Amino acid sequence: MSKIIELPEILANQIAAGEVIERPSSVVKELVENSIDAGASQITIEIEEAGLKSIQVTDNGEGIDHEDVPLALRRHATSKIKKQADLFRIRTLGFRGEAIPSIASVSRFTIETATEAGRHGTLLVAQGGEIEEHVPTSSPVGTKIKIEDLFFNTPARLKYMKSQQAELSHIVDVINRLSLAHPEVAFTLISDGREMTRTAGSGNLRQAIAGIYGLATAKKMVEISASDLDFEVSGYVSLPELTRANRNYITILINGRYIKNFLLNRAILDGYGSKLMVGRFPLAVINIQIDPYLADVNVHPTKQEVRISKERELMALISQAIATSLKEQDLIPDALENLAKSTVKRASKPEQTSLPLKENRLYYDKKQNDFFLKPQVAEQQLSFEESAKPVHEATDEKAEPQSTSVKFAERKPVSYDQLDHPELDQASLERAVDKLEQEEKSSFPELEYFGQMHGTYLFAQGKGGLYIIDQHAAQERVKYEYYREKIGDVDNSQQQLLVPYIFEFPADDMLRIKQRMELLEDAGIFLEEYGANQFILREHPIWFKEEEIEAGIYEMCDMLLLTKEVSIKKYRAELAIMMSCKRSIKANHSLDDYSARDLLFQLSQCDNPYNCPHGRPVLVNFTKSDMEKMFRRIQENHTSLRELGKY
């Protein structure tokens, strides 16, 4: 008797649903993407109990013909590709023909649809993938799909759903990403009768950003644009003063498809250079137009992982586009806004792991046919508070002498659990180290020094108003650029070690390091195999101080494992940051007038005078307008979304 059998269609669809439909947000994503592929300009999503009770997606797309509706529930039935060559030129969001049958197999499924050419609409009802009703009906052109009792026949999946608030947050995240990817589509998301998100569908990306993040955020987004023979990059990135604690506010789009790509995330951060604080991430919406032949989206059923040809060239293009746009901006933070943020008390809430789930403050004025921002009134009185903390000198600890003939290097364990990709870099490595890229000099205001406060802050005035300068951050930037140039040129001459070092690695890391050993050797680091899972180092480049060898070699190997490259410049940049921090003046240190003026002059000559190497602001600016607002001499005006489109 044959042991191998062909699985029934329903069971096969339920197995496929395990990959395609992970949670209610997966259903929303697949249905909305189908609506976009159908040419819809208006899409309404209505959910109950975070989608577990019901999900309804209504669009005004082209609809489905009566005879095609049952086929939509058959696995691998699709209208989007017809031959093998189409796989290499995919221009639609969906193409696998798995989503609808997978959804229908784990829910009570109802679809109403009509085409412009059809004499009537179609109603189809299915339960657990089995069609129960397929009849003509009267309905407008477009499609309405309703999913009820999701996972009713797969209780194991239902058991592991998170709280309704968490599942709702995932749905909002999906709609926000799709709204940014397709600003030409008007999206409306309604949860339990309450409107969560509404976008105008005007095609203006900045207006879509305002509809999701708010007007204040949209005003601080800088437009970017760049292209070459293969790629066209456009979108918006936030000014360095506007950051978040995680990468969840970075949206990368390829041909209108939201994707997750760690290397492109890194390219965005590289474009900021040292303008971002360590551990902080920008808001960004990067839209990449690419020949479909260069992007393989047939990697995973969710289609969020994309393999890109010429990825390094694309990374360089993105970084350059961001760096160029930021260079043209005034990067001195507005002091009044920073002051308001630090002194107006708000209820604390836990850090979110997705795009913010909150009630939109935009309201619609029917008379003016436009959106406006509801004003927020801060009742807390503003006050100046000293918030800077002194930077302490680091202390050097001398290691005890070794009695053995070789030194066994010790390292701190590196956790790969938090990495988005096991081969790629993480924030702790990528943020503080990429500082040796030459930055164009920006226009710096002419400042007239007139005083110091608490031995910490310098006061100066210029055409732009009052400037307050953090003297430690200012000198740190000056000294960093000095040390950067001083140690930037690398000599690969070798020096023998009297006592070799032994480095231990896990077996999988050993294999990957051996595969890429040439990159280490190009950097002047020659490791030899020495026993099981061990390398021995008998000589070192002369630019490596001996006290740096232990930590430095491990750091170079980590860089190799995570980023598939070894950059001496990045490693040396870390050293320049450390030296500049240690040797700069600290808080509570009074400067005479000559020293203060000289420091401001040296700062004005820096490539990037606005941030210290760690990304903290060097100076803030109170404009005349800011002062008048503080003393209630003028009132702020509210900006409409229509006016925002003029930016």
UniProtKB/Swiss-Prot annotation:
Keyword DNA damage: yes
Family according to the record: Belongs to the DNA mismatch repair MutL/HexB family.
Record-level Gene Ontology MF annotations: ATP binding; ATP hydrolysis activity; ATP-dependent DNA damage sensor activity; mismatched DNA binding
GO BP annotations, alphabetical order: mismatch repair
GO cellular component: mismatch repair complex
PANTHER family named among the record's database cross-references: DNA MISMATCH REPAIR PROTEIN MLH, PMS, MUTL, DNA MISMATCH REPAIR PROTEIN MLH1
Biased composition (Basic and acidic residues): 387-400
Function: This protein is involved in the repair of mismatches in DNA. It is required for dam-dependent methyl-directed DNA mismatch repair. May act as a 'molecular matchmaker', a protein that promotes the formation of a stable complex between two or more DNA-binding proteins in an ATP-dependent manner without itself being part of a final effector complex.
Record flagged with keyword DNA damage: yes
Name of this protein: DNA mismatch repair protein MutL
Biological source species: Streptococcus sanguinis (strain SK36)
UniProt keyword annotations, A-Z: DNA damage, DNA repair
S-S bridge residues: none
The gene coding this protein: mutL
Protein origin, superkingdom: Bacteria
